[in-house]
Amino acid sequence: MWVGLGTPSDFNGRDVRGKLVLIQSMPMPGVVAHSAEYIDASQRAAEQGAAAVAFNVAIPGNYQVQTGPGNSRVPTFTLGSDDMTALREAMERGPVKVRVRLATEMRQGLRDASVWGVLPGTTNEDIVVMAHHDSYFYGAMDNASGMSVMLGLAEYFSKIPQSQRRRTLRFVTTSGHHAGSLGTAWLHDNRATALANTVLAINCEHVSVTQAYYDRNAPVLRKSDNIDARRWWVNGSGRLASIAQGAWKMFGVTTYDTMENNASGDMRAMDRDVPSVQLIESSVYYHTDHDVPDVVPDAGLEAVARGYAKIIDQVNTLEKAVLLPKAPQSSSSARP
C-alpha cells in the first residue's frame, strides 16, 4: 500500500495491516537526513500493523543506500528511485501482491582496532589528528577522503625535523565509527590519560565531495564543477576559531555560514574534551553505492590538508591556555 510521505494524514482511512507499506522519503539532502526519519514514517506503519516497510529516498537513479529503519520493528527495506517508480506504476494498473524475503547474516568474533602513528615533538604536549577507517559501499568520500588528508599531513610533518616540531603529532585511524564511534568513545572515556597532554584534536571526515544539484526539468542528479561547502566546528577560544577560519579562507575551503551546535560524525563522542576543529560534509552521495573516487575532487583534499597544516603550525606558536574555550557562564550552558 502506497502511503506517500507517511505522515499521519497519509495513513488516515487506510488499513495497512498485513501489507507492505511503501513510503516516499524526501532527501535532505540525501541519506544523511530524509523526511521519513523526521516524521517517524516507518515506525508509524509498523504501529498500524504493516507486515513490512519499503521506502525510497528520492535520489534520481537507482541508488543503493544504507540507512537505519528507525524503530519500525518490522522488516524494512530501501528501494532505488527507478525500482520504486516501477512498483508504484504497477500498483496504479491494479492490485499487486508481493513476496518479501529478508536474508541476513550474523558474524561472530570480528575485531577492529584504532591504529596509531606518532611523530615525536620536543615537549610532552601533543596534537591528535584522527580519521575513521570504516565505511559503507566504496567509501571514497566517507571516509577515504579523510584518511588521505590525515596521511598527507603525516607525510608533510614527517619531513620537518623533530627539533622543529614543538608538539608531538599523534595520528589515529579510529575504529567502529559506524558501530557507535567506538574509537572516539574510548578516547572520551579515557580522556584523563589518553588526552591529558592534548592541546588540539582535528577530525578528518568527509572533507571533499563534488557539489551536485537536482535538475529542474527532469529527475536527474547533475554534478557541478565545484566542491560542496563543509559543516564546521571549533571547540575553543575565539583565537582558535579565528585561526581555523583564516586558514580555511586562505586555501579556498568552502564552509557553511554558521558553525554547527556540535561536532557531528566521529568526533561527536569527544568534541568538548579538548580544543577541537572539524570540517565535514554529508552530501547526496553519503552512504550510497555512488560514493566513489569520481565524486571526490583532489583540489578539495589539497585545500583541506593545507588548511589543517596551517592550523597546526599556528597553534604550535601558542600556549594551550590561549586555545581553551571560555568557562560556561552558568549551569544552564553546560553540556548535558
Locate predicted features.
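Soluble metallo-hydrolase cores and metallopeptidase-like ectodomains found primarily
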Residues: 2-13, 68-141, 152-155, 159-160, ...
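Extracellular/luminal Protease-associated
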Residues: 1-78, 155
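Metal-dependent peptidase/peptidase-like ectodomains
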Residues: 84, 122-124, 174-278
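Mature extracellular/periplasmic domains of secretome proteins
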Residues: 11-16, 40-51, 67-70, 118, ...
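Acidic, glycine-rich active-site loops and adjacent beta-strand->loop/helix elements
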Residues: 26-28, 59-60, 133-136, 172-179, ...
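Second-shell loop/turn segments in exported
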Residues: 2, 26-42, 72-77, 102-105, ...
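Structural recognition of the beta-strand scaffold that forms the well-ordered cores
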Residues: 2, 19-24, 51-56, 76-78, ...
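His/Asp/Glu-rich mid-to-C-terminal helical/loop segments that flank catalytic regions of hydrolases
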Residues: 284-336
